[in-house]
Amino acid sequence: ILRKLAGDASKLIVAAVKDVVITCPAYFGTAERTATKNAGEIAGLNVIEIISEPTAAALYYGCAKEQGEKTVLVYDLGGGTFDVTVMHVSPGKIEMVCSDGNHELGGKNWDDAVMQYLASEFCSETGFDGDFDEYAQQDLRLKAEKAKQQLSTREKVPVMMDAAGLRARVEITRQTFDEITEALLNESIEKTDAAIALAAERGYTIV
């Protein structure tokens, strides 16, 4: 994968990519970071540094270039993991204060919630009470992901579903989406509050 990413980057900038900085999740320890660095070297890359994704985010937004000092929070909800990190930033330096999260909480959980809702609505509409086969499951996941994205800008989204020779048009609203994923969002907020509280105990206030 790293070799492919480096190759794609080389094509984009029309220059060979050899020296790299690789990002990793905030919860990665020494063993995981070493394994990541080794993977980069196996891919033929010169790994200059392994840095955490929150640090990379702070660098990207230019926090370290600003004058003065500040404490910032990076909320990182990925496809399969969630991390929240508090960092103290000063000119030329980024220091991690604390980190929290859930390695099994991510966008996939939101997709699963939408899938379950759509499947339930489909069964109610058609009377189907069996299991979705592999093809129907894959189709359902793709449509759930698309519906989730569309609900960012729309109040409701219609979804055409097919399974076991049956077809039905079901609908999901933004309000319903918020309701079925509320527990997931609250979990991330609780982790965020815990990180903020721990940072405060250590003398740092987010501004």
Predicted regions and their residues:
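Oxyanion-binding/catalytic loops of NTP- or PPi-dependent enzymes
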Residues: 7-207
